[in-house]
């Protein structure tokens, strides 16, 4: 089923369905799968020497990471399948051509509802569920901006370029959560390998491809297509590009912290430190 851009807004309430669905899925998977799996992974003699508080903290963090890996791995596979099927996906000049009357497939519509629902869920999970970290305020700001950006791209019909943006971002998160799981289970080689892939993907996708291809397309190449309209969508254009630049600021902030982690790893004979994301978790 193909959905014309202006008609897509009628499906937007599905985001709330997905948000509630993620709460339920996380609740049951935590209790039935993730925590039992974590307890099994920390059942070795060495793990049993930890005090109960430390062991429980590791189980909680392990459960968080495997939940995120499940999600990011699934949606990354989904978006890559969408990109493979869409003729416009690799041609940046097509991202805004024919706007606002572009058509989206039902799969792409559901993908957007899923992603927006997940980040809305993540805002509440960050407050009430997940381990509190030192970069809480930055992470909360990121989730809010991302939720708004996904919803905005969908409702305004900028969903083609938005799809590519989501594909770029989820790839890094897959490597990140895998590195965390390796670190929590003391698989140092795996942690170092996936942290390296995480850092490399962050640099290439979020700090090179995102600004020099995606933001360039959104702020410059888009004008070629949008000027064909009777009235240039000035407000929509500036709001969208402002949000993309805000996202880039988050990327630069976290890249600084990733570089600190790289230096820490080099000084630690190649072993990844406790927090492979941003050096923001409390030491355990």
UniProtKB/Swiss-Prot annotation:
GO molecular function: sphingosine N-acyltransferase activity
Entry keyword set: Endoplasmic reticulum, Lipid biosynthesis, Lipid metabolism, Membrane, Transmembrane, Transmembrane helix
Record GO biological process: ceramide biosynthetic process; long-chain fatty acid biosynthetic process; response to molecule of fungal origin
UniProt GO cellular component terms: endoplasmic reticulum; endoplasmic reticulum membrane; Golgi apparatus
Annotated transmembrane regions: 9-29, 69-89, 108-128, 148-168, 195-215, 243-263
InterPro entries the record matches: Lag1/Lac1-like, TLC-dom
Primary location recorded for the protein, binned into one broad class: endoplasmic reticulum
Record's subcellular location: Endoplasmic reticulum membrane
Membrane-protein topology: Multi-pass membrane protein
Keyword Translocase: no
Residue ranges of domain TLC in the record: 60-267
The UniProt record lists the keyword Membrane: yes
Function: Mediates resistance to sphinganine-analog mycotoxins (SAMs) by restoring the sphingolipid biosynthesis. Could salvage the transport of GPI-anchored proteins from the endoplasmic reticulum to the Golgi apparatus in ceramides-depleted cells after SAM exposure.
PANTHER family, A to Z: LD18904P, LONGEVITY ASSURANCE FACTOR 1 LAG1
Full protein name: ASC1-like protein 3
Source species of the chain: Oryza sativa subsp. japonica
